[in-house]
C-alpha cells in the first residue's frame, strides 16, 4: 500500500513534502531530484500493471523451459518477457503519461535550469500567448491518438 501512495495522495501534498525532504538532502534544483520524483510518481502504475500480469502468469511454462534445457536467461527472454510485455508496456505508458502531466511537482522540485516540456507549456500559457503552445498541444493530441489506434490495431491482430 505504501507503493501506491502517490496515486492516492493529492499531488500538491506530494509536491510540498517532496520539496521539504529534497531541500534537506540537497536534491532541489537538480536533475537527479527531478528524475527521482518522477520515477516515484510513475512506479505505482508500473507495479500494478506488471503485478496484475504476473498473477496470470503460468509458472509451469518456466519449469518446462528449464527442464527442456534452456538456461534461466534464455527462459526469461523467450518465455517470461513476451508474456508479461503487454503489462510492462502499458505500465510504462501510464508512467510516461503521469510524468508528463506532473507540472506541479516539476514547479516545486526543478530549478530555473531544469525545463521540461510540460513546464514550458504551462509557463507559455500563463505568461505569453504563443502559437507554439497550440502547435505542441496539437502534436501531442495526434501522437496520443496514433498511439491508441496502433494499440487497438495490435490488440485486434492478436485475436
Residue locations for each model-derived region?
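Cytoplasmic-entry segments and transmembrane alpha-helices of multi-pass inner-membrane transporters
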Residues: 1-20, 62-63
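A structural signal for multi-pass alpha-helical bundles of membrane permease subunits
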Residues: 15-25, 93-98, 126, 151-152
